[in-house]
Amino acid sequence: KSNGVEIRTRALVEKVIVEGGSAKGVRLAGGEEIRSFIVASNADPKRTFKTMFQSEELDEDTLKRTDSWKTTAGCVKFLAAMNELPDLTQYLGSNYDANSIINIKIMPSVEYHVQSWRDAASGKVSSCPVMNIQIPSTVEPNLVKGKGHVMSNWVLFEPPTLKNSTWEAERKNVGEQIIDVISQYAPNFRNSLVDWTVQT
C-alpha cells in the first residue's frame, strides 16, 4: 500500500472495459468498475480474449489466433513453506551461496520433457514432472516471519482433466511425487517442509 498498490483477492473480473479501442479498466463480477491507464491479464489468452471482451472489440487476427491456440496440457502449482533452503551441494559443491539460488529448473533431459508432454496429452498425471522452481524469499526475506523460506513451483505438464481420475483424488499423490523428485536433487527437502499445497 505504501507504494500505491492495492491487491484484491477473490475479485473475479467479468469484463475488460473498452472505450475508443483501448482498455480503460475492468468490471468485476459484482458490478464494480476499476479504472486504470494499464490493464494486464494473468489469465490465459483464451480466457482473456474469449470471456472478458466482446468479439467486436477485438481485431479478426487476434480472434483467429486465439481460436487456434491449443490448450490440451497445463500445469499444477506446488507452494511450500520451508525451515531451510534446499541443499544442492551434491551439484554445486560445498562453497555455493544458498541464498543466491532464486530459480531452479528440473528437466534432466529432452526425453524427460517429451515424456511429460506425452503423459499430459494422454490425460495422465506426468511421470516426469518438469519443474520451474522459484524461491523468492532469498531476495525478499520479508515474505516470511523469522527464519525460513517459501517456494513457488510451476510443474509441467499436467492435463487440465485427468482421463481415469480427478485432480481432487490425485492432489496429495502429485504433491508427494513432486517432493520425491525435488528430494533427488536436494536430500533435505522433505524434512525442511513446514507446509505445502498443490493447486490445480
Regions found by a protein language model. Give the residues of each.
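Mid-domain catalytic core of redox enzymes
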Residues: V5, E14-V144
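Conserved redox-cofactor binding core of oxidoreductases
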Residues: K1
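FAD-dependent oxidoreductase catalytic-site/capping-region signature
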Residues: P129-T200
